[in-house]
């Protein structure tokens, strides 16, 4: 797995194993948000034709936030979630990915580099390494 940071308190994790691929971006907030922005990104390299369920991904990320609180007694507030709509199922993998992002933040694990997930009008995934 590759772990990156994003500007504005964000993190990205990319998991590729065999023929599966998952990308998750999370932006954190200093305080609880009234709602979480959920962005399903398109990719020109569509691995699967069926789209992942964004609401299930949101649930998995929020469960990981709860898991982190139980294990480390550290509270996180999520303001934005980014994922690729045609990445590999199942959605349950996003709980693990979110947990790894947050665990890395708690343990102050240094990321590979900084990355920007650009969201344009088409929501096409464009990754820029800084």
Describe the predicted segments one by one.
Residues 1-130:
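Accessory interaction regions appended to the cores of large information-processing enzymes
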